[in-house]
From Swiss-Prot:
Annotated S-S bridges: none
Subcellular location: Nucleus
Transmembrane segments: none
A GO MF term: zinc ion binding
Top-level taxon: Eukaryota
Gene: elof1
Organism taxonomic ancestry: Eukaryota, Amoebozoa, Evosea, Eumycetozoa, Dictyostelia
The protein, known as: Transcription elongation factor 1 homolog
Its biological purpose: Transcription elongation factor implicated in the maintenance of proper chromatin structure in actively transcribed regions.
Amino acid sequence: MGKRKSSKPPPKKVVQKLPKHFDCLFCAHSQSVDCILDRELGKGVAKCRVCNASYETPIHELSDAIDVYSDWIDACESIR
């Protein structure tokens, strides 16, 4: 009698990393906006390296760079 065929363990799910650099809303350069999170002061800053446009917003411990950038987009849309 033979041995049972052992099954392979299921493959691990690939977790995509969140971006840290974004496209500028004003000068349209790609990957030119850097988001800096200062958790001690509780503020996040998104700043373009090309046109120096910047946006500052309050953050909390669960905030990430994408949250600061999306707040900037929402603020620009509310003005228009």
